[in-house]
Structures are given as C-alpha cells and as structure tokens.
Amino acid sequence: MTNTKRGPLLLILFAALTAGAGNGITIVAFPWLVLQHNGSALDASIVAMAGTLPLLVATLIAGAAVDYLGRRRVSMISDLLSALSVAAVPVLALIFGVDAVNVAVLAVLAGLGAFFDPAGMTARETMLPEAAGRAGWTLDHANSVYEAVFNLGYIVGPGIGGLMIATLGGINTMWVTAGAFCCSILAISVLRLEGAGAPDRSVLTEAVLAGIVEGLRFVWYTPVLRTLAIVDLVATGLYMPMESVLFPKYFTDRNEPTELGWVLMALSIGGLLGALGYAVMSRYMSRRATMLTAVITLGVAMTVIAFLPPLPLILVLCAIVGFVYGPIAPIYNYVMQTTAPQHLRGRVVGVMGSLAYAAGPLGLILAGPLADAAGLHATFLALSLPMLLLGVVAVFLPRLRELDLASKP
C-alpha cells in the first residue's frame, strides 16, 4: 500500500483515526476516574487542566521537533510516549493497588499524555500536502477527509470509552487506549513519503529556540493567521470546560457514563459530517461565512444547553455544533499550509495550536470551582454568553476576509 499513489495518504488517515480514538477514550476515562473518587468538579477540572496546560508549551516544541527531527520519526515517538502514559494507569493499579491511582497521579499522567500528543498530530498534519499531491487530491479535499477521519476517531473513542468503563472499569479501559496508539505507530512505521524523513538542515536555524521564535514571528506578522489564532484562543477557552468538566460532572451526578459517551459522540458525528461535507460546501460558501456561522451557532447552542434540557435536545444541539464546526479545522489547515513555507510548516502549526490552547487552562480553572459553587446552569451561562459576543465581534474583523484570499507561497 505504501507504493500506491494513495498509500501514504491512507496510512496517515489510519494513524489519525487510531490516535484520535485513543484520545477520545481518555476524554471519557480520565474525568470518570476522578469523579468516581469524590464527585468533585474541581478535582475533575484539575485533571482536565493537567491534560491541557502542557499543550501550550508542547505544541510549540512539537512544531520545532517536526521541522528539526522529521515528520515520520516524531509521529511514531509521540504515539509511543502517549501509549506509555495511559498504560501507566493500569500498571500502577496492578503493582500498588487501585487506591494508588488518585487525583494527583491521574493529573500527572494526563499531563504527560497531553505533552506528547501534539507532536504526533502536528507531524501528521504537516505531511498532508505531499500526500494529497501524490494521491491527486486537492488540499481542501485532503484536509476535509483528514479532519473527518480524526473526528471519526473521536466518535469511536468516547463510545468505546463509555462501554469499556461500564464493562471493564475505568482503569482497565486504559489498555484499549494504549492499543489504539500502537496501531497508529504501526501505520506510520511503513510510511514512505517525500518530506517525511530527515529535514533539510540548510534552511533551518541552528538553535531550536531561535527556530521557535521564527515560527512565532511568522504567525504574528501574518495578519490572517494572527486573527485566527486569537479567535481560536477565546473560543477554546470558553468551549473546553463544557466538554472536559461540565458534561462529565452532569452525567456523573446522574450515574450515566453511557449517556456522556453519547453526547461526545454526537459532537464528533456532527464534526465528521461537517468535515466530510466541507469539500462540497466550499463551492457554495466562503471560508469566512463558514467560520462566522460556526462561532455564532456554538454560542447559541451553548446558551440553550445552559438550561440543561432533556438529553435528546442536548444530543441534537451537540450534533449541530459539531456539524458547523467540522469545516473549521480544514480551513485552519488550509490557511496554514498555503501561507507557511515548507521548512516552517511544523512550527506554524505548532504556534497556532499553542495559542489555541493557551486559554484552555484558565477556563478550566474558573469552570470547576464555579460549577461546585454556583451550579452547572450558571457555569454554562458564564461560558455561553461570551461565546455569543465573540460571534458578534468576529463579524466585524476585517482580516477574516483574507481567509478566501490565501494562496500557495
């Protein structure tokens, strides 16, 4: 398969699917293990924050690692370390007993997993242009299918996570997660693709830190990238607590792990359909209109969810949010891929990712205590109303018009 025109692209897609499934399981499993101990949303937010705080630095390092060490190598190393971090949960339970897997241990392991994950994701994304060209696909088509497959992993992952927790327990579920990462390693290990191996050192700065700064400067002085990064930073900070703390808290209080999996699956199913449909939608909607629709819809949906309606309505709203947000990642990927030179591609992807995650820990710090003190309804509103405001502000951002002007350097 590696010698066929589509072989490299299919291997990248398979790796994205299995790694996404592994991460999807952890979204359910880590908060569930914490909330089983004492039911505290604060503790759950601490572990969720531990799983996001390292992303700010890790994505910067990941981008540099991809450019300096090579995309294929970094992808495999990242997935191996991610597999070890989640496998450590059942290993510690076997050696020291279940009580050893406490909130502090889970926070450390979640942090380690979060530190390793971005490198693999960045490496796979930066290989897409060459893989798409070899397969004869347009970049929009490749990005939409890639994000759809990644979302499919997040559909399978939470579903497996909820079922495994109900049948095997939260700790043993981590074995399945480790296995998913190993499948990704196997796929990339047989990949052969131009630009995926050793990098061209002649176009790189000697110092890695200087290379990271070079990536930061490129993003900051490219107006469309700077605007996208700021919008994503705010949206991530407002949305992440809902998925990582508020939904787990709501369904844990009701002892409904399977229903939590359904909600996360609804988000991912919507995202899958939205990402798959983007290649067609892009013929009729501008990138700017697509993005504005996504941000405004997310704010409206979060506001309705704040009133904790019946589960069927929550599922519908989550599916809608996933659908309108599905094309956003392909749009971001396209703009990064078509504005950044090849030797800077990894660092630009890393910088954009790190800025998106910068607000996540702050949102989690605030959401956990607020949920314990004021309740889920007030916390949802505290997140949804600023999201609505972001949608209104985005309408008047002139740089977003450049989304439809991006072209290959």
Swiss-Prot record:
Topology class, membrane: Multi-pass membrane protein
GO cellular component, one term: plasma membrane
SUPFAM superfamilies: MFS general substrate transporter (SSF103473)
Principal subcellular localization: membrane
GO terms, biological process: response to antibiotic
GO molecular function: transmembrane transporter activity
Family: Belongs to the major facilitator superfamily. Drug:H(+) antiporter-3 (DHA3) (TC 2.A.1.21) family.
Function summary: Efflux pump that contributes to intrinsic antibiotic resistance. The pump uses the electrochemical gradient as a source of energy. Confers low-level resistance to tetracycline and to several aminoglycosides, including streptomycin, gentamicin, 2'-N-ethylnetilmicin and 6'-N-ethylnetilmicin.
Protein name: Multidrug efflux pump Tap
Organism: Mycolicibacterium fortuitum (Mycobacterium fortuitum)
GN (gene name): tap
